[in-house]
A protein has these predicted regions:
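N-terminal secretory signal peptides that target proteins for export/translocation
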Residues: 1-2
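Sec-dependent N-terminal signal peptides
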Residues: 5-14
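Acidic, polar-rich low-complexity tracts and alpha-helical solenoid repeat scaffolds
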Residues: 17-304
Length: 304
């Protein structure tokens, strides 16, 4: 969720690309890797096990099984005391099941960590969300009293931060610090207010901003958040399309891009962009020159 955690989002995304041609991995593969790691706890074996868990989490469609895999990953990361990895998996758990007791514990822990690290906007949004998600929790009243009154209007606060993206811009036309902060608060809002009508829109704006920052792993994770948890939202088709477009043009992964484009056509066959997506699939991997030549050649063909 927080911007500095995007490295693991990128890691999980790259893993999904490597395994895109496979079905859900068998659980006994995880058991084998886990046994290997326990008998020889090297960083390499840890990474292999974590990658397999990450891959399975991305592919698993059953909510209960996915939750078990996430918790298993968190326990593994606890052994190495890697807070960033723990938090990243914890955030996935909160997305999946925000009302669980485990999610509640991690949400408060992450909020407190953000507060300690000076990310006050993120911390306060998470804490306000905590009090709204768990109003009967014994800690909620005290937390509520610690949140500044400016956070009573979160949408206004987020919009104000959005305007600051272009204050004192750098050579790329944006204020990087404010842009990263905007991404953070949009994610924070969606995490604690998953059912709010504005959440998917905030995630989409955050994805576009992270792409402007060239943080492609983060962008992919945000598009996936939208398509996974908000499949019926108006932003979902565009999020899926832009994921494919980013894969093709920024990450130079035409095979994965084609897979995403085909998924788009399967899910949204009557979408206004279907014709454009078909064109992209037909010409994927071709240079602009080759595409132009093909178009010109088509124009010269006699009409039937």
């Amino acid at each position: 969720m927080m911007y500095r955690l995007s490295i693991l989002c990128c890691l999980l995304f790259l893993i999904s690309c490597k395994n895109s041609d496979k079905a859900v991995e068998q659980m006994d593969e995880i058991a084998i890797l886990e046994t290997t790691y326990k008998s020889n706890p090297t960083l390499e074996n840890f990474n292999l096990l974590l990658q397999k868990l990450g891959s399975n989490i991305l592919e698993e469609g059953d909510k209960t099984k996915k939750e078990a895999l996430i918790i298993r990953s968190i326990e593994l990361c606890k052994e190495t005391k890697n807070t960033a990895y723990i938090n990243t998996f914890a955030i996935e758990l909160i997305k999946l099941n925000p009302k669980s007791e485990v999610s509640k514990t991690y949400l408060l822990s992450i909020a407190e960590e953000m507060k300690s690290s000076g990310k006050n906007e993120v911390a306060n949004i998470l804490m306000k969300g905590y009090t709204d998600l768990y109003p009967d929790d014994a800690k909620s009243e005290g937390i509520k009293n610690s949140i500044p009154a400016t956070y009573n209007n979160l949408n206004g606060l987020i919009n104000d931060l959005g305007t600051k993206i272009f204050e004192k811009p750098d050579v790329n036309g944006i204020n990087k610090v404010n842009a990263e902060k905007y991404v953070d608060v949009c994610e924070s809002y969606a995490l604690v207010y998953p059912n709010d009508s504005l959440s998917a829109g905030y995630l989409f704006k955050a994805a576009e901003m992270s792409r402007a920052l060239n943080s492609y792993g983060k962008t992919i994770s945000l598009y996936d958040w939208i398509t996974t948890y908000y499949p019926n939202d108006k932003n979902a088709p565009m999020a899926l399309f832009l994921k494919g477009f980013l894969l093709e043009n920024d990450l130079k992964n035409p095979d994965k891009a084609k897979e995403i484009y085909e998924s788009f056509l399967s899910k949204y066959p009557n979408h206004a962009m279907s014709k454009d997506v078909n064109f992209l699939i037909t010409n994927i991997g071709k240079s602009d020159k080759e595409i132009i030549e093909k178009i010109e050649k088509t124009k010269t063909l006699p009409s039937k």
